[in-house]
A protein has these predicted regions:
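Compact, glycine-rich, soluble single-domain proteins
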Residues: 2-94
Length: 94
């Protein structure tokens, strides 16, 4: 699935991932391929991309590899929203 992460200043990530874990208002939730369409608010926390590797170095510099979990890259947000539909998601955050 394709995920794009945008802040007011720049595009933090755009590419294919296996799944994404998000800090929802009611707790962390996981989006996988073929997930039902969703629009949700996000609270302060970490967006976790599950993917083999972040190939683009311009994007990779914004992420930390999570040592306890293979293929997991995190980006800290203060809040935002996600729209996911047809295996494509846009995360607007700050």
């Amino acid at each position: 699935m394709n995920i794009k992460i945008l802040t007011p200043e720049l595009v933090v990530f755009e590419g294919e991932v296996d799944s994404v874990l998000l800090p929802g208002e009611m707790g962390e939730f996981h989006i996988l391929n073929d997930h039902a369409p969703v629009v949700s608010s996000l609270k302060q926390g970490k967006v976790k991309l599950i993917t083999n590797k972040i190939e683009n170095e311009n994007f990779a510099k914004f992420f930390d590899a999570e040592p306890q979990r293979n293929n997991c890259y995190t980006f800290t947000i203060n809040g935002g929203v996600i729209e996911f539909n047809n295996n494509s998601g846009i995360i607007l955050c700050d």
